[in-house]
């Protein structure tokens, strides 16, 4: 599974870029907001979400872990797939989404092409309580994602442990939330080991 790509932007389409990594061009789909920040010929590091299906392998790229995590979170809503998740992230930042959900503002989602009244309502209802704003101003996924083994207190202890191991607090928070989303049943020991392994692998 590809978790990160670093290379130069070779070309760009309406909803994708070709990123050249050591002479190999990877087609990576991205939101409009991400595409707007990329320039051909420039070097970037992209966080990658890999979707493997029988008929294809698709890569989705993000400049921040925050956007990647919201890409996955949006797909937890019934009726939202990868294309719709990217469409929403093309119109709204993760912070915009968090504010709209907490304010139960369905209209902001209805304004997005392809999002009707029923889907907008599901987004608010199904995601309310799953996002929380932390003091630093970034957005994290709350522990309501069926996390069985990691309590909020334990999560904070893991973050502290990672900071002591050389992570910045922001890196530790993003690492913990990303791993927990992918594996809600992970133990604390495995969570720390996975965070260290991912960092050493450049993920």
UniProtKB/Swiss-Prot annotation:
GO molecular function: ATP binding; four-way junction DNA binding; four-way junction helicase activity
Record keyword Cytoplasm present: yes
Subcellular location field: Cytoplasm
Record-linked Pfam families: HHH_5 (PF14520), RuvA_C (PF07499), RuvA_N (PF01330)
Segments of this protein annotated with the region Flexible linker: 143-149
Taxonomic superkingdom: Bacteria
Keyword Ligase belongs to the record: no
InterPro entries (UniProt xref): DNA_helicase_Holl-junc_RuvA_I, Hlx-hairpin-Hlx_DNA-bd_motif, NA-bd_OB-fold, RuvA, RuvA_2-like, RuvA_C, RuvA_C_sf
Region described as Domain II: 64-142
Chain intervals for the UniProt region annotation (Domain I): 1-63
Region (Domain III): 150-203
Record key words, sorted: Cytoplasm, DNA damage, DNA recombination, DNA repair, DNA-binding
UniProt record, GO biological process: DNA recombination; DNA repair
GO cellular component terms listed in the entry, alphabetical order: cytoplasm; Holliday junction helicase complex; Holliday junction resolvase complex
Notes on the domains: Has three domains with a flexible linker between the domains II and III and assumes an 'L' shape. Domain III is highly mobile and contacts RuvB.
Subunit record text: Homotetramer. Forms an RuvA(8)-RuvB(12)-Holliday junction (HJ) complex. HJ DNA is sandwiched between 2 RuvA tetramers; dsDNA enters through RuvA and exits via RuvB. An RuvB hexamer assembles on each DNA strand where it exits the tetramer. Each RuvB hexamer is contacted by two RuvA subunits (via domain III) on 2 adjacent RuvB subunits; this complex drives branch migration. In the full resolvosome a probable DNA-RuvA(4)-RuvB(12)-RuvC(2) complex forms which resolves the HJ.
Family (UniProt): Belongs to the RuvA family.
Function, in words: The RuvA-RuvB-RuvC complex processes Holliday junction (HJ) DNA during genetic recombination and DNA repair, while the RuvA-RuvB complex plays an important role in the rescue of blocked DNA replication forks via replication fork reversal (RFR). RuvA specifically binds to HJ cruciform DNA, conferring on it an open structure. The RuvB hexamer acts as an ATP-dependent pump, pulling dsDNA into and through the RuvAB complex. HJ branch migration allows RuvC to scan DNA until it finds its consensus sequence, where it cleaves and resolves the cruciform DNA.
Name used for this protein in its record: Holliday junction branch migration complex subunit RuvA
Gene that encodes the chain: ruvA
């Amino acid at each position: 599974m590809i978790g990160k790509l670093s290379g130069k932007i070779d070309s760009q389409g309406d909803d994708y870029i070709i990123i050249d990594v050591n002479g190999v061009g990877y087609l990576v789909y991205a939101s409009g907001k991400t595409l707007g920040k990329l320039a051909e010929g420039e070097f970037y590091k992209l966080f990658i979400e890999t979707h493997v299906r029988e008929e294809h392998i698709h890569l989705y790229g993000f400049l921040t872990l925050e956007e990647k995590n919201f890409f996955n979170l949006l797909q937890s809503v019934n009726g939202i797939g990868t294309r719709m998740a990217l469409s929403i992230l093309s119109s709204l930042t993760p912070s915009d989404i968090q504010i709209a959900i907490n304010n139960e503002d369905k209209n902001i989602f209805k304004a997005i092409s392809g999002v009707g009244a029923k889907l907008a309502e599901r987004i608010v209802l199904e995601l309310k309580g799953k996002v929380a704003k932390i003091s630093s101003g970034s957005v994290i996924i709350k522990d309501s994602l069926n996390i069985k083994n990691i309590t909020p207190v334990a999560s904070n202890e893991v973050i502290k442990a990672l900071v002591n191991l050389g992570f910045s607090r922001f890196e530790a928070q993003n690492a913990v939330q990303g791993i927990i989303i992918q594996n809600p049943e992970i133990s604390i020991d495995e969570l720390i080991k996975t965070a260290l392994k991912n960092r050493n692998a450049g993920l």
